[in-house]
Regions:
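Periplasmic c-type cytochrome electron-transfer domains
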Residues: 2-7, 21-343
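Bacterial N-terminal signal peptides
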Residues: 8-18
């Protein structure tokens, strides 16, 4: 969330319609302007599943510890469905059980991300590449492992399971069971993880009782004075880009791979805010305990350093405004898809 620079674009145009904006400076938007703004957040239809059999196979693999070197760690260990497909630990653990330097990222809505790269630092160009890296390094994509991984051993485990052999033959006829096809199945499943329908969605669709008056004020702040929409606009609440928001860290994020771009140093990918209230602590390293503390971080503008996003400027909010923003973010918690979450 949160930058104070207001880009020229659809949302800004909506806010300014009828002498509305900035919203926080000139009061509540007109009904017409608010209605137009809400349309920008209307969720599209769920993506069609290209190969349901492959996605079902990927779901089985996602919950199976056979994919780890130790045989005890599954993808779900860092991506719990009931917590918005992350865990509540500030940082994830690798296959050896040791803490890494980063928190797991939510997996919801990734099928809508198009060509956007995957991970806090965008190292993986596709979900397939991310799945392969997680298995091959034993690090759950964190680049931090002390357990050697022999991919052929993991492939052999799957090949020796008659159930998996039958499922692979059905999903990918005539294809061998390899790291590539395992990753293909995992990615197919992950693309089916749509954000659950939330109270916010019901409000957007016309149910005025779905969210509180405080949350409605928070939505206006989100798209006005607090300017959170600059990075978190749209129904998925992410721009899929990388920003240094001034979090105290030695982790260079995107800058580890993009060394010649100053703004990419200490920059991390904007996470979706869907079901955000389920997954404290926040930021790439789990260093911010609560949504309220997130508000305070953005008010201060973060650490001043050359890479800090020019959108990060100090902001003064009242206590009620902070509470309204938190109330709004809490309306983004979606229902769990039991069919995909069931082990």
């Amino acid at each position: 969330m949160g930058s104070r620079w207001v880009p020229v674009g659809m949302v800004t145009a909506v806010l300014c319609a009828g002498a509305v904006g900035p919203v926080a400076a000139q009061g509540d938007p007109s009904p017409a302007a608010l209605s137009a703004l809400k349309r920008e957040y209307r969720r599209p239809a769920a993506l069609p599943v290209e190969n349901q059999t492959l996605a079902d196979l990927g779901r089985d693999l996602f919950f199976d510890p056979k994919l780890s070197a130790s045989g005890t760690t599954a993808c779900v260990g860092c991506h719990l469905p009931e917590l918005g497909w992350v865990v509540t630990e500030p940082r994830s653990r690798n296959d050896s059980g040791k803490l890494t330097s980063r928190k797991s990222q939510p997996l919801i809505g990734l099928g809508h991300a198009g060509a956007a790269s995957v991970g806090w630092d965008g190292r993986s160009p596709t979900l397939e590449a991310q799945a392969k890296a997680s298995i091959a390094t034993g690090s759950m994509s964190m680049r931090e492992t002390d357990r050697p991984v022999k991919v052929e051993v993991i492939e052999a485990r799957i090949k020796s399971d008659a159930g998996y052999v039958a499922k692979f033959n059905k999903a990918l006829p005539n294809a061998a069971i390899t790291l590539d096809t395992i990753a293909q199945a995992l990615a197919a499943f992950e693309r089916t993880l749509e954000p659950g329908r939330a109270a916010f969605d019901r409000w957007i669709e016309g149910d005025e009782q779905a969210i509180s008056e405080s949350a409605k004020r928070g939505f206006v702040l989100f798209n006005g004075k607090a300017n959170c929409f600059a990075c978190h606009g749209g129904w998925r609440f992410t721009d899929d880009r990388f920003h240094d928001i001034g979090v105290a860290t030695t982790d260079r994020g995107r800058g580890r791979d993009v060394k010649d771009d100053e703004l990419m140093q200490f920059a991390f990918k904007t996470p979706t805010l869907r079901s955000v209230a389920l997954r404290p602590p926040f930021m790439h390293d789990g260093s911010v305990p609560s949504l309220y503390d997130v508000m305070r971080l953005y008010e201060k503008g973060g650490i001043d350093r050359p890479s800090r996003s020019p959108m990060m400027l100090p902001l003064t909010m009242t206590e009620q405004e902070r509470l309204d923003l938190v109330a709004f973010l809490e309306t983004l918690t979606g229902a769990i898809d039991e069919a995909r979450a069931k082990q």
